Amino acid sequence: MNYTSTRGTVAVNETYALLHGLAEDGGLYVPALFPTNCLKYDDIKDKTYQEVAAVVLAKLFPCFSEAHLKEMINSAYSDANFSTRDIAPLHSLLEKVSVLELFHGRTQAFKDMALSLFPYLLVAAKEAEGETKEVLILTATSGDTGKAALEGFKDVPGTHIQVFYPTDGVSPMQAEQMQKQEGANVNVTAIHGNFDDAQQFLKRLFVDANTAKEVAEKGVMFSSANSINIGRLAPQVVYYVNAYAELVAQGAIHEDEAFNVVVPTGNFGNILAAYYAKKMGVPIGKLICASNQNNVLTDFFKTGTYDMNRPFYTTISPSMDILESSNFERFLYYISGENSERTAQWMKDLKSTGKLSVNEDEFKRVQANFSGAYVNDDETKAIIEQVYNSYGYLMDPHTAVAMGAYMKELEAHPEDGARHTIIASTAHPFKFPTPICEALDIKIGATSYESLENISAVTGVGFPKQLADLQAKPLRFTKAIDKENMKQEILDFVDIFSK
């Protein structure tokens, strides 16, 4: 299968797209010919998560042999990496609502779903391309990607990873997970700025030919573990396909019966994966984009204008504190009718004016698949309390945002209540002890761990082993730099491992 840029027409093979992440013109790689309606229920029924993954990913990466793909998948989705054999279990919350739990991996966040597999895909792509340079993975994180990428690439031969996170833009537990990261090939740096600052810099760096030449002379090339890389996005499609099979198996829906999906998202990758699943044949009806107070996506789905000229808010759902959603470019490409010139112009508009607008016909295509709602911090806490008190189920703030968006959508469109809905749960609640304590009126401890002990005592929810073990580990990475110094931080890291 060939992949092409959202902004151009040059085609590359799958392994080139996996290895390089971002196209040379700054666009994102997408299948040149998307495998539309290629999945049927019979293809995925009565299969394990790993078997479903093999079916789905063979459609997107046919370059890998069946045996090689299964080997990578089985290594990634193993008992050592996930605390449940189901990998992404569905929890029945209400008769018509199921929670898709995506937090049972090594770092207790949905990013594990892709980043457990992505290192295998990247190493395989490197071998297929005959690339001998060391690969430096550059990653910006709003909380969860960083730790999951670090854990995925820890001590993987031929790779190194540099993660940047905003000093005040992640939860204390998320920061501690990264600051205590193990591995000889990792570096973690905080920046004085927000996630958008870090992500925008890295996207510029990926198309900086001079810097690429400078590090190439030292035997190094750049790649990305953010969802701008198709190798990060593709594995996320799997859990929506698997969820469909599970809903049918549980008797929640019939074969080919439509269901809705609510996704809390900031960078648009997670909900785009659900859109890909729909394009591939999964009977997803409405995709509901759930946002926090950084509601640029909500406004787009209501107006057809994406406008970043607005205040940036630091919220209790920090992984969604994003105004420039990178994967939104892939979505624009599809609603333009796969028009790369139109997409490139939109991205120029966004860069020069901070906003873009779609026309009436394009907006109809948007509304045929998507809607959006946002939930502020006070509402998020109220939902955490309501869901726990009513159903005994503890949600993290991001999942609560999704639940709140579902409630608002149901209020606006009561007919949606007749259709089964999946709520994507993106993180374990213990990664966010302070807002959980505030929501449930539990005493906040002197440390995050004391708060978690208090939450556990009240709710009966046990500590994930990885978080329990984290307390005793030493801090390794405590540096914070100005965002203008990110390039030098990268070059200094290159100098360390390329000697």
Labelled PLM ranges:
Residues M1-K499:
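PLP-dependent amino-acid enzyme catalytic core
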